[in-house]
Amino acid sequence: MPQGCPVMAVSTPHERARPLAKGSTYPAKDLCSQCGLCDSRWVAYVKQSCAFLTQRFEAMETAAHGRSRDLENDDELYFGVQQRMLTARLQRPIEGAQWTGIASRIGMLALETGLVDAVLCVGQSPDDRFTPVPQLARTPAEVLAARVNKPTLSPNLKVLEQLPGSGIHRLLAIGVGCQIQALRAVQPTLPLEQLYVLGLPCVDNVSRQGLQTFLESTVSSPQTVVHYEFMQDFRIHFRHSDGSEETVPFFGLDTPKLKDVFAPSCLSCFDYTNAGADLVVGYMGATLGRQWLTVRNPKGQQLLDLVEAELDVAPVTSSGNRQAAVQQGIEAYDKAVKLPLWLAQLIGLVVERFGPKGLEYGRFSIDSHFTRNALWLRRNHPEKLEAHIPAFAQKIISRYRLPKT
């Protein structure tokens, strides 16, 4: 370079970009899951990062775990890359946690031990317990205050905007599949030395208004619900603010009213088990009362090491046969059948006693959602069908008969 010529700093795409303006149409349009990426300057990479614009499971798994899942191994076909699967519960459950509090405890310990500088988690609005507020928690108390799932679309990745200049060099991100797919895609561009990812399994999120419709059509006192979950006993468990619990059988849902309440992003998602996370903490592969954990790589084991001494650990188990129930469910859901409550209760009791349990229940839930979502995609976005459904989901879906139209 000739003497006297100024050295020009080369900026990266996200340094030149700005978050989308409020009220803008998001690139994924109706399929947008509001993950928050476009609410940060990392919107610069949205075409390569958005789970609903570009499916990149194999590349993501290989980058995060060193390999993609083995499609000939049934456990990996369903649950993703893994080093270890187990069930567990905290020996001393966290008061007010959704289950026993394993995810919250890991976040707290990651800060207490100095493993990370901050935890990306989701608090709640002071005005509404179901309105999510993503945050970079710096203290265990902030992580604890964020306990309990928020079953609405949450823009977690908008907090990426806060990273530059924050002093955060090591981050634990807690999130669901669509958020983690985008996060993994932009990971090389983040101002971080280390990123740990604790994933939550996720299906059937809703907008805040959709949640209200669901609660009002399902539960006796919508205004007092603190949290809820679709559980392994084929019932939805609601906890109310007075500490009482209420359960409603899956089969008693008002399907005609609720069929369109779930977000289009969730109806076109095939990342139920959070393929890009280092460690996954949920319940779908465990028996009732326990949580299901999948360690995908050494970082995932490092996260589990933080808390394992505090856990009651047991092997995963599996029993029953899901396939007939899945096939019948495809047809019932497609016809939007609503059963009388007495019949729904009876079917629920029979299925709870004789139906799939443990990993087989997890496969039941995956099969049911993947077949439903394939149908929804075929009917609503046929142009995306071939490229959008990953190979593992195609293999699972091919085991069932879907309506032809």
Residue ranges of model-derived segments:
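Gly/Ser/Thr-rich loops at beta-strand to alpha-helix junctions
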Residues: 99-102, 126, 173-183, 204
